C-alpha cells in the first residue's frame, strides 16, 4: 500500500465579489489529488481536497517540499499500526520534517490541503464517509446525521442595491437556511447600518443574522461599529479587527455584549490558544471560533486545536469551521461541532455542497458516500478527475 503520486493544480475562482478588505478577482485555489495503489471497485483510490477559499493556490511549496517528502518516505512508514490504511498523522509529521517553528501560513495551507486529501483516501479505503471516520477517532463514535449550516453571503458586488441584498437573503431563506451572514466595513458606517436594517426587516422571527468585517477595522472604527450594531441582536460580529490583535479584540469584547467570532485567519494551534487566553472571548456568551482546517495544517492538527480549546473551557458547539464546502461539513459532523458555513451561488464549483443537498430548517443531512463526498458535486468532481487523469 503506497501513495504513487500527488498532483496539484491552481484553479481561478473568477469572482467579482468583494468583502471590506479585498476583492476576489485574482483569487485562486489549489486542487490536490493523492493517488494510491489501493484499488476499490476496479479503480485506484484517489483522495481529493482543495485549499478552501480566501487564500491563494500554494502549489509551489507543495511541489518544492511537501510532495517530495511524502513520495520519498518509506511507504510502510506512512501506514497505520496494522498496515491496513494510511496514517494522516504520520504523513503530517513527514511533511513537517526540517521545518522551522513559527511562520505558519507560509506552509500550513499547502500541508493542510494535502493532509485533508489523504483523509479522503483513508475514508474511501475504509469504505466510510469521512464524517463517520472522524467521529470514530475523535468523538467517541458519536456520528451526527445532520449539521447546522449558515450562509456566508451578503457580499459587496458591483452596482448592488439594498433590494438586491434583500432578494439574496430571501433566496437563502427559501432554500431552507435559518441563519445568514452579510459583509460590513466596505461602505461608510451609516450605509452599512442601513443594509443591516434592511436585511433584519425581511428575516422571520426565528432567523438569525451575523455580520463579518473581515478584519478591516482599527480601534476607533471597530468600537463605532460595535456601538452601532449592538441594538440588532446579531448572532455574531465577525473579525472586527486584525486577527492577531488580541488586545484590541479583548477591548471590543468588553464593550460589545453580543457574541463575537474570529479564527479563520489563525493557522496554528498555538495561535488559537493565544486567542482564547488573551483575546477576551467568552464561551458563556456564545462567541465562536472559526479555524479553517485545510488552511491550518489539516484535520490531525485541527483535532489538537479542538482539544486545546476544550482544555480552556470551550464547548465544541462554539466551533464553526470557515470554508463553506464538503470538507468543513464532514469535519463539523465528525467532531460534533456547532455547524458549518455555506457559500451558495459564489465561488463557482468550489462553493456549496453536493448537487442533491437539501436543507431543512437550517440543517443539512450528512451523506453516506465514502470519503469527503466530492463525487456528489459534479462540476467540482470533473475538475478533480481531470487532475487525476
Residue ranges and their predicted role:
Residues 105, 109, 115-158:
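Glycine-rich, aromatic-flanked loop segments that form ligand/cofactor-binding clefts
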Residues 135-256:
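Metal-dependent enolase-superfamily TIM-barrel catalytic cores that perform enediolate-based chemistry
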Residues 227, 233, 244-370:
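Shared catalytic-loop signature of beta/alpha-barrel
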Residues 32, 44, 66, 114, ...:
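Conserved, mostly hydrophobic/aromatic
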Residues 1-59, 65, 350:
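Structured beta-strand/loop patches that form or line metal/cofactor-binding pockets in enzymes
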Residues 371-389:
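Extended hydrophobic packing segments that form well-structured cores
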Residues 39-126:
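Metal- or metallocofactor-binding catalytic centers and their adjacent structured scaffolds
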Amino acid at each position: 500500500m503506497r501513495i504513487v503520486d500527488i498532483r496539484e493544480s491552481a484553479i481561478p475562482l473568477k469572482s467579482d465579489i468583494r468583502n471590506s478588505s479585498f476583492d476576489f478577482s485574482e483569487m485562486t485555489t489549489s486542487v490536490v489529488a493523492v493517488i494510491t495503489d489501493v484499488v476499490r471497485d476496479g479503480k485506484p483510490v484517489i483522495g481529493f481536497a482543495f485549499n478552501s477559499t480566501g487564500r491563494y493556490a500554494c502549489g509551489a511549496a507543495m511541489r518544492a517540499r511537501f510532495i517530495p517528502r511524502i513520495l520519498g518516505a518509506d511507504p510502510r512508514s506512512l501506514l497505520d499500526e496494522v498496515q491496513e490504511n494510511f496514517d494522516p498523522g504520520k504523513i503530517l509529521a513527514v511533511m513537517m520534517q526540517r521545518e522551522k517553528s513559527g511562520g505558519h501560513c507560509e506552509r500550513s495551507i499547502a500541508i493542510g490541503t494535502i493532509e485533508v486529501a489523504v483523509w479522503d483516501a483513508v475514508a474511501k479505503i475504509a469504505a466510510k464517509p469521512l464524517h463517520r471516520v472522524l467521529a470514530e477517532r475523535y468523538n467517541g463514535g458519536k456520528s451526527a446525521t445532520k449539521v447546522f449550516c449558515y450562509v456566508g453571503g451578503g457580499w459587496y458586488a458591483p452596482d448592488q442595491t439594498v433590494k438586491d441584498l434583500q432578494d439574496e437573503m430571501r433566496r437563502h431563506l427559501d432554500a431552507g437556511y435559518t441563519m445568514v451572514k452579510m459583509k460590513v466595513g466596505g461602505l461608510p458606517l451609516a450605509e452599512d447600518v442601513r443594509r443591516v436594517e434592511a436585511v433584519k426587516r425581511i428575516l422571520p422571527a426565528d432567523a438569525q443574522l451575523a455580520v463579518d468585517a473581515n478584519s478591516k477595522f482599527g480601534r476607533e472604527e471597530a468600537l463605532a461599529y460595535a456601538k452601532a450594531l449592538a441594538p440588532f441582536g446579531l448572532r455574531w460580529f465577525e473579525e472586527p479587527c486584525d486577527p492577531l490583535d488580541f488586545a484590541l479584540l479583548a477591548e471590543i469584547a468588553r464593550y460589545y455584549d453580543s457574541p463575537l467570532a474570529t479564527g479563520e485567519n489563525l493557522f496554528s494551534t498555538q495561535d488559537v490558544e493565544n486567542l482564547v487566553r488573551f483575546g477576551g472571548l467568552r464561551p458563556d456568551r456564545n462567541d465562536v471560533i472559526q479555524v479553517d482546517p485545510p488552511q491550518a495544517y489539516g484535520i490531525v492538527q485541527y483535532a489538537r486545536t479542538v482539544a486545546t480549546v476544550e482544555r480552556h473551557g470551550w464547548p465544541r458547539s462554539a466551533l464553526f469551521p470557515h470554508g463553506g464546502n464538503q470538507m468543513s461539513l464532514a469535519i463539523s459532523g465528525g467532531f460534533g461541532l456547532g455547524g458549518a458555513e455555506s457559500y451558495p451561488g459564489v465561488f463557482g464549483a468550489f462553493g456549496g455542497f453536493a448537487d442533491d443537498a437539501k436543507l431543512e430548517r437550517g440543517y443539512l443531512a450528512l451523506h453516506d458516500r465514502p470519503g469527503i463526498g466530492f463525487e456528489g458535486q459534479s462540476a467540482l468532481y470533473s475538475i478533480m478527475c481531470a487532475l487525476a487523469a
